[in-house]
């Protein structure tokens, strides 16, 4: 069983797993969780490599020494330091309460293993971003999804291919913080928001009657509207006009190819 970051395998038509020892075996997408970003791949052949233990009991904090290891063996492993544990809001309707940020940034971060001092797996590499603690210039870091988010959903991923809970409402809306405002940065062609008249550049003021001052607050208010299928009402400013936009949300997973071997 291989744990990776989901965007590498979502809607994949074929998967091959290779090791630094050589050889390759086919793989199958076993599960993908939209909320954490974790993806599971089942090897359809024997992998001649040892498994790594999950470090779910380790407290990971700023200053911890870690290793970020990508494919390719030791030559693609980078000694790093945890520079922060903090909230991360992504423009694509994504939010982590306590993401792990490490530096220096690994050039091959996607799906890389974050390994703690005891040799256990403490996270999976997701992004290359810029980070500032407010006292220094912004620097390149990797954002890592913490491993402790996996155990609560692992059985569901193995059984159903996704967490067995009501899915969050998905709008198909890309948003960003610009000068203390939440701005529509783009719209997914297949998403429900693209059919409502929203345009890039529109400023989002509130979800229903609840003002939103940050991207994280915006996503939380959207998800508080109910499960997928719920209507999400936005107050939006365009030029000098304010208007309400009603978006019939959907389940994002329905828009994607799903695992078929369950």
Q: What is the predicted function of each stretch?
A:
Residues 28, 155-162, 183, 190, ...:
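PDZ-domain C-terminal substructure recognizer with occasional recognition of PDZ-binding tails
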Residues 104-108, 112-113, 171-206, 210-213:
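PDZ/PDZ-like domain segments forming the peptide/carboxylate-binding groove
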Residues 74-81, 134, 211-218:
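Short, Lys/Arg- and Gly-enriched loop/turn segments at beta-strand edges
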Residues 4, 27, 41, 63-68, ...:
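Terminal peptide-recognition signature
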Residues 27, 49, 68, 75, ...:
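C-terminal cap/linker of serine protease catalytic domains
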Residues 1-77, 99, 108, 180, ...:
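Conserved active-site neighborhood of the chymotrypsin/trypsin-like protease fold
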Residues 44-52, 77-140, 169, 177, ...:
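Active-site region of chymotrypsin-like
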Residues 4-6, 12, 19, 70, ...:
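Sec/Tat-exported extracytoplasmic proteins
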């Amino acid at each position: 069983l291989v744990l990776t970051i989901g965007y590498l395998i979502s809607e994949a038509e074929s998967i091959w797993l290779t090791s630094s020892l050589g050889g390759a075996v086919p793989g199958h997408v076993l599960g993908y969780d939209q909320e954490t970003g974790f993806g599971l791949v089942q090897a359809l052949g024997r992998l001649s490599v040892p498994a790594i233990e999950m470090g779910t009991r380790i407290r990971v904090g700023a200053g911890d020494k870690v290793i970020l290891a990508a494919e390719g063996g030791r030559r693609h492993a980078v000694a790093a330091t945890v520079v922060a544990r903090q909230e991360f809001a992504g423009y694509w309707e994504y939010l982590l309460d306590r993401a792990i940020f490490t530096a220096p940034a690994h050039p091959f971060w996607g799906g890389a293993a974050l390994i703690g001092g005891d040799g256990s797996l403490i996270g999976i590499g997701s992004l290359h971003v810029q980070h500032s603690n407010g006292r220094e210039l912004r620097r390149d870091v990797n954002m890592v999804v913490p491993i402790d988010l996996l155990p609560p959903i692992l059985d569901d991923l193995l059984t159903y291919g996704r967490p067995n809970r009501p899915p969050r409402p998905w709008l198909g809306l890309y948003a960003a913080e610009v000068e203390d405002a939440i701005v529509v940065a783009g719209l997914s062609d297949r998403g429900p928001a693209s059919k409502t008249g929203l345009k890039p550049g529109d400023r989002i003021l509130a979800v229903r009657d609840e003002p939103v001052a940050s991207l994280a607050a915006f996503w939380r208010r959207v998800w508080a509207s109910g499960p997928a299928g719920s209507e999400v009402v936005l107050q939006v400013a365009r030029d000098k006009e304010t208007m309400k936009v009603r978006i019939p949300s959907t389940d994002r997973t329905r828009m994607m190819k799903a695992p078929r071997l369950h």
